[in-house]
Amino acid sequence: MGIVLGPNQYGKAENRVVRIYRDTERHEIRDINVSTALRGDFSAAHLTGDQLQVLPTDTQKQTIYAYAKEIGVGQSEAFALALGRHFVNDTEPVEGCRIEIDEYDWERVSVSAPDGTKREHNHTWVRKGQETRTTILTIDGKGEAGTETLVSGFKDLVVLKSTGSEFHDFLVDKYTTLIPTADRVMATSLVARWRYLGTDVDWAACYAGIKQIMLEQFAEVQSLALQQTLYEMGRAALEAYEEVAEIKFSAPNKHHFVYDLSLIHISEPTRRS
């Protein structure tokens, strides 16, 4: 059997960009982590070590920094589109690319004014710890003949509800020890990704709105299973935003089991099972 080179791509991972705008007395900050991967016919680099078709990964890094200065860092989706279109359309050997951006949010520190009121500080922030906003852009082909697929979302959003969740009537075998319950704590570290139908989108408004809908559904749905809650979260977001084609979730259970205090001879009030 012959040996052949399989599909391949290459790029520069995790290029951290912190862009601070100091045009006015009130500064603004944008904090992103950008990874690039380029696709094309790079077989010569693998088979003979010929680098003539290879745009160095260091050049990709420098391009990210240059674009952060030249076009600015606004919405991550717009930055990814500008960067990806440049690599594919302006670099002859490149036939496609994947741009991934993680975005980190900061909020202003609140300080006391001379009159005793609180105000937001003009140039000091504290890093928010809720979730990381994500953007993934895939481009296949050059110019108008190419296709652009943009997926937005978030990861590491930890949510918990202390009631309003049930789990019972499940399949049981000889190894099952889980006790059915009509009232439990439900928690997860949520990853959500939604694919847009196009690129003429108000990215910030969509992100904020979709996240809010998902949180409301998580809170309000009387959950018989985490899967049911996720479906309702996705359904509600899709109904509200026609710009979105599909939504995918990853949501591992973060279990919170009731501890049997009778083991240490402490009684507790009767609770629903």
Language-model regions: role of each:
Residues T134-G209:
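Charged, well-structured binding/catalytic surfaces in domain cores that contact anionic ligands
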Residues M1-V17:
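Short, Gly/Pro- and small/polar-rich lid/capping loops
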Residues P93-C97, L238-S250:
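Short acidic amphipathic segments
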Residues T24-D90, T181-E239, I264:
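Histidine-centered catalytic/metal-coordination loop motif
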Residues V17-I20, E28, Q51-T59, R108, ...:
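Intrinsic, low-complexity N-terminal interaction/targeting segments
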Residues I264-S273:
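Single conserved hydrophobic/aromatic residue that forms the stacking wall/gate
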Residues I71-S152, D156:
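Hydrophobic, ordered structural segments
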Residues R19, T36-F42, I101-D105, G141, ...:
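Beta-strand elements of well-folded, non-transmembrane domains
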